[in-house]
């Protein structure tokens, strides 16, 4: 007897009347006149499959006691369903109960609406819900599409280090990695912590970005990307921030900001097309329960050409909008989410690429423009969320890079390896970063980024 996934059983590609076996968990059960109708899910798709068990089965009394969350193996004949809302069902010839729910009344995942706040408290069980099953499958679809896009376009995937000595953003919000005894810290003659006695012989941190490391491979392999975990010790209790998240960071050699922006547009549209093509069932659920525009916003995003405007122009548009914003709009200040959303939703009505930001509000590695006041940086803004991608052309001129590092108070000797790229065959190059969880939030219409990752890490929260 063939073991199949629920998705495969419901797809209509198996012979009707054939014998199959499915393995999964009970979503719901109802009984009627010697019959038990068991909705079984294995996580392979949004819909469950109905298993119909009758009272001729030797363990029918056991079957009737099944509750949500119990695990089972059902064998039987695959037939077209007579009921509404399902294409096929299984007429069971046997139901083996693998695992019971210890106390159904206290089982946290009940077949009823539950708030995201409650589900964060039981994050180890929340993938069993409709919502987080859908989010997880979409997250997986996006991750697979990321690698597929870059592979098809000739990029090499680079594994950048998680433990590092460099602050790629220059912001200093890094988690320290140490094996020193926190109670009896070794001190040097000046009374400072002696990190020479630490595991690596120096002060080390969790990475905030793989960009600096991946640039090394860009300047040898031309087109590369990294996709991995990053960490920010930013004490932000917001719906938009995580302490641990995943970043996608491509880097392209012999490229300027315009080419970087084109890559970002192609990339996002490819990802959204993949989700529409592969996860329609999950998107339909999200459109019904979470974000009514879950499908239409992705279709609109794919079909709309990106608008590109200069930061200075964006500031003028905002100042002349007549709208009262919570945050001030002035040249030299970074754009806030409310400003970004006004540009994309109320003024332009489609994705926007804002370019050429003031040099003092962007990172040291971004290429200084000829005006000396702005850098070749870009933010891709999406309706409904604001910034979704941040990128730039990198500073390839050693003297200018050194001046920028001095401006930011960075020790150029500490970054000597990064400076080497400008000393040995330097070329113009560019790249961007996309926070993967922010992408999941946008696609799924979630209101809190802590629901876009299996086990959220945030200030004061590191459970499981």
Curated annotation (Swiss-Prot):
Coiled coil: none annotated. It is found in: Cytoplasm. The gene is asnS. This is Asparagine--tRNA ligase. InterPro entries: Aa-tRNA-synt_II, aa-tRNA-synth_II, aa-tRNA-synth_II/BPL/LPL, Asn-tRNA-ligase, Asp/Asn-tRNA-synth_IIb, NA-bd_OB-fold, NA-bd_OB_tRNA. PROSITE patterns: AA_TRNA_LIGASE_II (PS50862). Homodimer. Its EC number is 6.1.1.22. Keywords: Aminoacyl-tRNA synthetase, ATP-binding, Cytoplasm, Ligase, Nucleotide-binding, Protein biosynthesis. GO terms for molecular function: asparagine-tRNA ligase activity; ATP binding; nucleic acid binding. It catalyses: tRNA(Asn) + L-asparagine + ATP = L-asparaginyl-tRNA(Asn) + AMP + diphosphate + H(+).
């Amino acid at each position: 007897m063939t073991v199949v996934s629920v998705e495969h059983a419901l797809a209509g590609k198996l012979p009707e009347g054939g014998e199959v076996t499915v393995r999964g968990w009970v979503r719901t059960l109802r009984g009627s006149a010697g019959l038990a109708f068991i909705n079984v899910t294995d996580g392979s798709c949004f819909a469950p499959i109905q298993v119909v068990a009758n009272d001729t089965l030797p363990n029918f009394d056991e079957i009737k006691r099944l509750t949500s969350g119990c695990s089972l193996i059902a064998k039987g004949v695959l037939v077209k369903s007579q009921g509404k809302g399902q294409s096929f069902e299984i007429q069971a010839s046997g139901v083996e109960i693998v695992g019971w729910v210890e106390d159904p009344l206290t089982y946290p995942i009940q077949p009823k609406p539950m708030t995201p706040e409650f589900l964060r408290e039981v994050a180890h069980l929340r993938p069993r819900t409709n919502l987080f099953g859908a989010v997880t499958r979409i997250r997986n679809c996006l991750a697979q599409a990321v690698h597929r896009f870059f592979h098809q376009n000739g990029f090499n995937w680079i594994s950048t280090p998680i433990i590092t000595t460099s602050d790629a953003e220059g912001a200093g919000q890094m988690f320290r990695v140490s094996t020193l005894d926190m109670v009896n810290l070794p001190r040097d003659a000046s009374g400072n912590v002696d990190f020479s006695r630490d595991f690596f012989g120096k002060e080390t941190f969790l990475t905030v970005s793989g960009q600096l490391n991946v640039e090394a491979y860009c300047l040898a392999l031309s087109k590369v990307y990294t996709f991995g975990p990053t960490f920010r010790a930013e004490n932000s209790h917001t719906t938009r921030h995580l302490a641990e998240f995943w970043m996608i960071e491509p880097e392209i050699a012999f490229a300027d900001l315009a080419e970087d922006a084109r890559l970002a547009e192609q990339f996002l549209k490819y990802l959204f097309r993949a989700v529409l093509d592969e996860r329609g069932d999950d998107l339909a659920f999200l459109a019904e329960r979470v974000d009514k525009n879950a499908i239409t916003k992705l279709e609109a995003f794919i079909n709309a050409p990106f608008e590109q405007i200069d930061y200075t122009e964006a500031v003028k548009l905002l100042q002349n909008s007549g709208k009262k914003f919570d945050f001030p709009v002035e040249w030299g200040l970074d754009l806030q989410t409310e400003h970004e959303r006004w540009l994309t939703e109320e003024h332009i009505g489609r994705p926007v690429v804002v370019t050429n930001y003031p040099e003092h509000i962007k990172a040291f590695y971004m290429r200084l423009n000829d005006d000396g006041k702005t850098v070749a940086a870009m933010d891709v803004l999406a309706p409904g969320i604001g910034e979704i991608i941040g990128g730039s052309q990198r500073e390839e001129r050693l003297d200018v890079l050194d001046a920028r590092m001095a401006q930011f108070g960075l020790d150029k000797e500490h970054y000597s390896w990064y400076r080497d790229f400008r000393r040995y065959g330097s070329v113009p190059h560019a790249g961007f970063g996309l926070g993967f969880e922010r992408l999941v939030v946008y696609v799924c219409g979630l209101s809190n980024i802590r629901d876009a990752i299996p086990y959220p890490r945030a200030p004061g929260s590191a459970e499981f």
